[in-house]
Amino acid sequence: MAKQGKTPNEAFGGDARSGPGISSLPRQLGSLVTILDEVRSGTSRTRPELIASTGLSRAVVAQRSAELCASGLVEEAELGASTGGRAPRILRFRSESGYLLAAELGATSITVALTDLSAGIVDIHEEPSDISAGPHVILERVKALFDELLERHRDRPGQLWGVGIGLPGPVEFSSGRAVAPPIMLGWDQFPVREAFASRYGAPVWVDNDVNVLALGEVRAGVGRGHDLVVFVKLGTGIGAGIVVNGHILRGAQGCAGDVGHIRVTDDPTAVCRCGKIGCLEELAGGRALGRRGEAAARQGASRILGEVLAAKGSIDAEDVAHASHQGDPVALELITDAGSLVGGVLASLVNFVNPSLIVIGGGVARAGDGLLATIRQTLYARSLPLATRDLLVQRSALDGTGGVIGVASMVADELFAPHTLNAWLDAGHPGVLSRLDRVESRA
């Protein structure tokens, strides 16, 4: 474990004042960040490609790329392909220059990771948890897991540049605080960002878990190459994250995509944990599947679910999914009903934002092909033909890593955004951001 009072930068063998020497660079941040983004993403890998993709002049590209190389953020690598004349050098983002800590908190699990500056996973750990235990218990556990990651990699070169947290509820991104989260008792307005910034000497960003899952899918999953992606998490709750041109669409306050609380019935008995009536999450979320499956088992309607109930005393969504895989008609009906409700809500979303890809993830998404088929069938039946002509609906393939990849990607994007880069240029290291009262974040 890292010693108390010792910053992660010291644990990594660094000093908060050291790092890339970009404090001496001129303040033409627009072109500098444009080139850095192109190189970071791999969109452009040589100076001729940068000139073609950005529209910047040869002189500006030469100067900014030289400054980035001098800073240590970018380096010249092997020769690229020649298009006539001398072959250009490939420019490579030095993702090993620093490290990021990322945590995805779900309703029933914690996943933490140490990554490089390109969100490449260096080390990862997942364990069961219960978000209802409250922020003090959960965040202390996250800190302990972070400390273990840092201790295991204390001899690696580089410094900690940022920390990111994904929470399973509405998050006001500008403040980094959950706001009236339905399943997170005690988390409302809790200062999550401050709890980590003072401990780790690095800037901290907090976002909704579905937003970062969506970003992770775009950066490392089936969403690569798509301009408008909707990620739908079907877990204990239901939510959607929207990524447009590589950036999370958060809305004015950060709650864009909260489809789990769209009303799908007027039944007064369908009271959601948010306090409202008839929410999608109350009827089609993991908690609802478990509740309905247990009711069926107690009524003797399902032999398979009845055996599970007798063995463990309760039924959850995973049990319903397993029963559906075995052909249990009751479980299959429950899965089909949930898929129809989800597909109906997504049809409205498709008509509204016209995505090219919808990715289905979360624990309930592992219920099998029947769920995905029902979602597709309902969605296509209720959406406009033009909106679905080229639409793909696929299951996530990231298998538990998408959240932390998305968290780390979000942190890296914020670190190298113009407004943030400008705030730490003079210090030469982003650790200075942890001492600022507030870092303006993109909504």
Give short role names for the model-derived ranges:
Residues 1-79, 83-159, 200, 266-268, ...:
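ATP-binding/phosphotransfer module of carbohydrate and carboxylate kinases, centering on a glycine-rich
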Residues 41-42, 118, 184, 220, ...:
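Short helix-capping/turn signature of helix-turn-helix
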Residues 76-77, 203-208, 242:
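General beta-strand structural signal in soluble alpha/beta enzymes
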Residues 116, 173, 243:
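Short, acidic, Ser/Thr-enriched surface-loop or helix-capping motifs
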Residues 121, 178, 248-249:
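Hydrophobic "anchor" residues
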Residues 124-228, 370-381:
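Glycine-rich phosphate-binding loop and adjoining helix at the ATP-binding site
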Residues 209, 235, 407:
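Active-site glycine-centered loops adjacent to acidic/histidine catalytic or metal-binding residues
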Residues 226-284, 440:
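Glycine-rich phosphate-binding loop of actin/hexokinase-like ATP-binding domains
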